[in-house]
Amino acid sequence: MASGDELKRRLTILGSTGSIGTSTLDVIERLGGRDRFEVAALTGNGNIPLLAAQARRMGAELAVTADGDRYGELKDALSGSGIEVAAGRTGLSEAAERDAGWVMAAIVGNAGLGPTLAAARRGADIALANKECLVSAGSLFIDAVAEGGGRLLPVDSEHNAIFQVLENDQRHAVERIVLTASGGPFRTKSLDEMQHVTAEAARAHPNWSMGLKISIDSASMFNKALEMIEARHLFNLRPDQIEVIVHPQSVVHSMVGYADGSVLAQLGCPDMRTAIGYALSYPRRCDLPVERLDFARLARLDFEAPDEVRFPALRLARRAMEEGGLQGAVLNGAKETALGAFIEGRVGFLDMAEIVEEVMNDLAGLPAATSMDDVFAADEQARQAAAGMIP
């Protein structure tokens, strides 16, 4: 089991060139860089110049590109550095298996499932930013973490908030958790207005700086829907214990309600480096140069119930949790296909949820996964079914 408490932490970052990966490296450098952290492996996809620069800067032992065709390019970029180079699935597996007590799982999508599962099974502490591990693989992934004996440290700001305020010796007294949602750029728009919004308009998140896909997921609240499913597995909750509240300021990141009526919340300025820093230094707290919350300047905190007519993704997540089986994988696979069609202008914003619901109807009753092959098969079925509904 990884202790996670050593003075110099040895780590691997799966997905170092993405948003979470680059933020993780930023936090590492702010906390002392190579004096305090030893980088076993970094993995990326197509941004070879950035991956090579990161590997050189951090003195990584191994650099991996998930794109097998780019092996030569990465090899040339790291020529003379002494850094090992690998590529493709084999390379990702090698990075996951490399001896490191702490692993940031930040590869986006199903590509992150295999290496993250492998790292969990060998007992690494997993800082989890990949949604599919819990949404699609659910109990399979939780079982792998238990089998390995490492710790699971959520990096999503909402789940990280719950993790921080959840008293381990009082879990039996948890009545509910409350995930906060900003409401996104369309919080006050009517149904008719939402049907005609564009992908570029969905990108304008009021509080967080994110990529196009995650911004659209946030605008449709599909991101929050996935977080509901993740929370169920992370904290071993019933579906009826998970609530969502719209909080436009994104200052209260989430809350835990206890049986005695107490509600504990974690607050902070919206900055992913806070959650990353907490996961990176756990169980200690580190000194991070992030913006401090000024309550006098903040003045007010607003909360409102989500409108599940305009944002049906929340209802679909609840259904997926209640039905169980592989419905999480089905929801996610269908959503990914519908999202791609929306970005391409082939379907409207509200059509995405309708497509997902139809696919969930068609594929209802798939049994719980017993292997990753089951998860991938359900995902592929959902994507194909969704594609068949798109003009």
UniProtKB/Swiss-Prot annotation:
Function in brief: Catalyzes the NADPH-dependent rearrangement and reduction of 1-deoxy-D-xylulose-5-phosphate (DXP) to 2-C-methyl-D-erythritol 4-phosphate (MEP).
Annotated residues for binding of Mn(2+): 156, 158, 227
Gene Ontology biological process terms in this record: isopentenyl diphosphate biosynthetic process, methylerythritol 4-phosphate pathway involved in terpenoid biosynthetic process
NCBIfam families linked to this entry: Dxr
Annotated EC: 1.1.1.267
Cited InterPro entries: DXP_reductoisomerase, DXP_reductoisomerase_C, DXP_reductoisomerase_N, DXPR_C, DXPR_C_sf, NAD(P)-bd_dom_sf
Pathway where it operates: Isoprenoid biosynthesis; isopentenyl diphosphate biosynthesis via DXP pathway; isopentenyl diphosphate from 1-deoxy-D-xylulose 5-phosphate: step 1/6
GO molecular function per UniProt: 1-deoxy-D-xylulose-5-phosphate reductoisomerase activity; manganese ion binding; NADPH binding
Family membership noted in the UniProt record: Belongs to the DXR family.
Originating organism: Sinorhizobium medicae (strain WSM419) (Ensifer medicae)
Catalytic activity: 2-C-methyl-D-erythritol 4-phosphate + NADP(+) = 1-deoxy-D-xylulose 5-phosphate + NADPH + H(+)
Key words of the record: Isoprene biosynthesis, Manganese, Metal-binding, NADP, Oxidoreductase
Pfam families: DXP_redisom_C, DXP_reductoisom, DXPR_C
Protein name from the UniProt record: 1-deoxy-D-xylulose 5-phosphate reductoisomerase
Binding site for 1-deoxy-D-xylulose 5-phosphate: 131, 157-158, 182, 205, 218, 223-224, 227
UniProt superkingdom: Bacteria
